[in-house]
Structures are given as structure tokens and as C-alpha cells.
């Protein structure tokens, strides 16, 4: 499932406005319904960010792979519930009714997904908790980043990844000055963990100066990375991969500049192009 977004594309000293297809990212709340002694009870066990479609298969596989059910036959039914919500008019909650609840330990299940390291959003147990706490928009005046600095930053990020050079299986987040100087770089197997490490380090060392800094991340740009960057008033977030629909929507809502598909001679600006200085 995808949607068209307006994008300013830079390539080889030329810019043009294009329509770009963006993968849709939406939260899915997974609730299980089971018999606790003689009483039917419902518990939300996880939220996962997903591309809508095949949601029943996703939930079925999730319940089996995590051994919440030992057999698929233990799932009586899976149904989408609630109102259609959001920009894409989707149901974002599913209830799975389980007919064999002997081995269900709801407290253990919740603990497991609250500490899930692969997705920081997945552990939250209410769609409401995804709402961004931040109230104020980012000032549009700063920072101003030359386009050549944008294109160089992924290479600099990679060159400073000590663990990636050894394993090839790790993400990085980097804080750069508007001159292209490295302020700090941190690595982790999870994109959101790498960004948390970076922000934590920058705060501890008092390195944050958002009026002349930007963030660069390996991989794609999703809702959670934008949300984390917003908490520190980061005005420009760039990535070597594609952004999701929710990432673009959130960046637009708070006046963040989001730049994706950054290569040595090209990039796409998805929101608030004014912060990127393009010299033809």
C-alpha cells in the first residue's frame, strides 16, 4: 500500500518537482481475547508499525511465532474492530479470540513486548501513546544546510562506523554541523537505539546546538526516528533510504525538513525545503 507525495528532487545540479510513491506506515494495535477462569477478558499486548494489508496474516503469524498460541487452531477468529481512522481511513485495531488460554501469561507477554529491542514503538500498549508530546513547531529559520554537505554526509557517516566495517550489520546515527563536521556518531543494531545513544551522548556532553546542526541516519526514515529527533528540536533529518508516509506527515506537522535517498549526486526533499541551500 502506498500514496503519492510531492517531492523536490535534486540530481546533478538540477532540481525538479515530482510525485513520489511512499510506503504507508500505520500503527496496528493487537489485542487478544481469552477466557481467564470463567470470564472473557481482552488485553492489548502490542502495537506494531506496519504497511497496511494482510493484517490478519500478520497477527496470526505474530501470535504463533511468539508462542502466544502453540497451534493456529487455538485462534478462533481474527477481526478488525473500531472506526476507520486517519488519512487512509483504516481500521488500526485487531482482536484475536483464543480458545485455549491454558498457557497464556498476560503479565509475561506484556513484559516481553515492553522490552522488545527491534522496535521501540511496538511495546506501547495504546494507540494514544503514539501521540507526540511535543507541542511547538520547529523554527523554520535555522539551520541552513548546503546541498553538497547533505550529499557528503552518508559517506562520512559510513567512514566513521567502526562496528559496521567489522560486521556490516549495524545502523548509525550522526550529528553534523552545517559545515559538514562530525559532532558525534553512535551505532546499534536498531535504528532507534542508535539515535537514542546519539542524543543521550550529545545531551550529556552538552553538544546539541540545533541552530547549526542536522541529523543523518542509515537506513529508512520512519515515524519513530522523526519523533525522537523532534524531541531535541532537530530541524533537518536525512537518511540514505526512503521515508514512510507517517514520517513525512509528522515532519510536515512540526516543520521539520526531511531528506531521503541521499546519494553522492542526488537526494529527495520531502518537507520544508527552505532549510536546504541549493546552488546551481
Segments (PLM) and residue ranges:
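Intrinsically disordered, low-complexity regions enriched in acidic/Ser/Thr/Pro/Gln residues
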Residues: 1-178, 182-185
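Surface-exposed beta-strand edges and their flanking turn/coil or helix-capping segments
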Residues: 58-63, 73, 109-111, 136-137, ...
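A signal for specific C-terminal beta-sheet/loop modules enriched in small/flexible residues
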Residues: 62, 117, 123, 196-201, ...
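N-terminal-biased segments
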Residues: 158, 170-210, 279-280
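Short beta-strand-to-turn element immediately C-terminal to the catalytic PLP-Schiff-base lysine
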Residues: 176-177, 270-272
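Feature captures the catalytic cores and cofactor-binding loops of soluble hydro-lyases/lyases
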Residues: 192-269, 275-278
Amino acid at each position: 500500500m502506498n500514496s503519492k507525495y510531492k517531492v523536490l528532487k535534486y540530481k546533478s545540479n538540477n532540481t525538479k518537482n515530482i510525485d513520489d510513491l511512499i510506503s504507508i506506515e500505520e500503527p496496528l494495535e493487537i489485542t487478544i481475547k481469552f477466557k481467564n477462569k470463567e470470564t472473557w477478558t481482552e488485553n492489548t499486548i502490542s502495537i506494531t508499525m506496519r504497511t497496511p494489508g494482510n493484517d490478519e496474516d500478520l497477527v496470526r503469524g505474530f501470535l504463533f511465532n511468539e508462542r502466544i498460541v502453540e497451534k493456529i487452531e487455538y485462534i478462533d477468529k481474527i477481526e478488525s474492530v473500531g472506526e476507520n481512522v486517519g488519512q487512509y481511513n483504516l481500521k488500526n485495531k485487531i482482536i484475536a479470540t483464543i480458545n485455549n488460554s491454558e498457557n497464556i501469561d498476560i503479565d509475561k507477554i506484556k513484559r516481553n513486548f515492553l522490552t522488545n529491542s527491534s522496535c521501540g514503538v511496538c511495546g506501547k500498549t495504546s494507540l494514544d501513546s503514539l501521540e507526540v508530546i511535543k507541542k511547538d513547531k520547529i523554527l523554520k529559520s535555522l539551520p541552513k544546510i548546503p546541498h553538497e554537505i547533505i550529499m557528503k554526509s552518508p559517506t562520512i557517516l559510513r567512514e566513521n562506523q567502526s562496528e559496521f566495517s567489522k560486521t556490516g550489520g549495524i545502523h548509525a546515527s550522526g550529528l553534523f554541523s552545517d559545515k559538514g563536521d562530525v559532532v558525534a556518531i553512535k551505532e546499534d543494531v536498531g535504528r532507534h537505539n542508535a539515535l537514542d545513544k546519539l542524543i543521550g551522548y550529545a545531551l550529556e556532553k552538552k553538544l546539541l546546538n540545533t541552530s547549526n546542526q542536522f541529523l543523518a541516519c542509515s537506513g529508512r526514515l520512519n515515524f519513530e526516528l522523526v519523533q525522537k529527533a523532534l524531541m531535541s528540536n532537530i530541524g533537518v533529518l536525512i537518511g540514505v533510504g526512503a521515508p514512510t508516509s507517517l514520517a513525512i506527515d509528522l515532519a510536515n506537522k512540526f516543520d521539520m525538513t526531511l531528506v531521503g535517498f541521499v546519494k553522492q549526486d542526488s537526494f529527495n526533499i520531502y518537507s520544508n525545503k527552505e532549510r536546504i541551500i541549493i546552488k546551481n
